[in-house]
A protein has these predicted regions:
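N-terminal signal-anchor transmembrane alpha helix of single-pass membrane proteins
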Residues: 1-29
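Surface-exposed cleft-lining segments at the edges of enzyme active sites
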Residues: 31-39
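Acidic-basic catalytic patches of nuclease active cores, encompassing PD-(D/E)XK
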Residues: 40-82
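Surface-exposed alpha-helical segments enriched in charged/polar residues
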Residues: 50-54, 131, 159
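Active-site metal-binding core of divalent-cation-utilizing nuclease and nuclease-like domains
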Residues: 64-107
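Short low-complexity, flexible loop/linker segments enriched in glycine and/or proline
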Residues: 77, 155-160
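Basic, amphipathic alpha-helical patches used to engage nucleic acids or provide basic targeting signals
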Residues: 94, 101-155
Length: 163
């Protein structure tokens, strides 16, 4: 009886090992359809980034496409509430984040608003984002996409947020 048990156990372990090896080989040899983007930012975002860098670059750090889930944390709460609130920010990001150069403290979020921000669903999303930033006491500055930006005016608008 013990001999049959050991034979069965050996075959069982070999079967599990074979499954693991096959799964590993499938993953190792898998082809994924992902392609590298030519640029992280859209043309409008890139133009705005370089203007921001020109007026702020020596004094602040400028990050792009920062996930809100990396900006904000939730205090201790029950799991249901945690997932409810976490899901609201999980896949959202802000276009730019201005941070203190010394300690990388977030100072100001910037949203570059194009025509898509006029759509009903986008307005609702923007209102939610604005409310989250307000409650977290992190200012958010919305600016319309433009072919060009007056650097002095833009700097004054940003300074109005006390950075």
């Amino acid at each position: 009886m013990l001999k049959i048990y050991l034979i069965f156990l050996t075959f069982f372990i070999l079967a599990i090992l074979a499954i693991v090896v096959i799964a590993f080989l499938k993953i190792k040899n898998a082809k994924f359809p992902y392609m590298k983007k030519e640029c992280l930012l859209s043309e409008a975002e890139r133009k705005f980034y370089f203007v921001l860098f020109e007026i702020l670059g020596n004094n602040y750090l400028i990050f792009s496409k920062v996930r809100m889930a990396d900006l904000f944390y939730l205090p201790k709460m029950n799991n249901s509430d945690f997932y409810h609130y976490q899901n609201k920010i999980q896949s959202k990001h802000v276009d730019f984040l201005i941070c203190d150069k010394e300690n990388i403290k977030p100072l100001l979020a910037i949203e570059l608003d194009d025509s898509s921000h006029l759509k009903i669903d986008r307005i609702s999303r923007d209102n939610l984002v604005d409310k989250i930033f307000e409650n977290a006491k992190l200012p958010i500055f919305r600016i319309k996409v433009s072919a060009s930006y007056n650097k002095e005016n833009l700097l004054n608008q940003i300074r109005a947020f006390a950075i």
